[in-house]
Amino acid sequence: MAKIRLIPQTREFYTLFDRAAQNLVVTAQLLLDLLEHYPDRRDLVDEIKEHEHEGDAVTHEIVQLVNKTFVTPIDGEDIYDLATALDDVCDFMDQVADELNLYGVDEVPPEAIEQAGVVVKAVSKLADAIGCLDGLKDVSGTLVDIHTLEDEGDRIVRGATARLFRDGHDPLVVIKWKDIHEDLEQAVDSCERSAHVLESIYLKNR
């Protein structure tokens, strides 16, 4: 007997997820530029904040659309989980930018720039995977790449934390940079959480 599917007419969900993903790509590059040129490019903090607000707005639109759509293209709970995971990526990037100003940072260690580079790569892979959501194309290879980048991020943050304590920095400096390093790593972790949701969606609907 043929399998019956109720296919919704709207493609809005995919459009909104693409918007969220592209917003992350831009935000990640801005964060890398900020860290590479801090404090000269403090102006980028405000620009990152604008993109964080855009991320919140898209998340709100997705949640509203779930609530008013009778038949969603994929499970409504999965849509919500993916939207919030993507929003978390943006929130952590924004938090890092805020902390640079809040903590009065004068100089950025190379490990933080390395971490931001990992964020850029992870977000780019995530955007590729989001682009495959419509049609449920296999993204297993891309998701493996994101996991590999998360491992790389873990390695960098462990090395950065060890150096902070080893080099005898002022305790306040250690606390400041430990927070920033951890939030950069959380941004990558949120990419991996998003990837896990995407994997679940693919397995449920293929």
Residue ranges and their predicted role:
Residues 1-206:
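Cytosolic, long alpha-helical scaffolding segments
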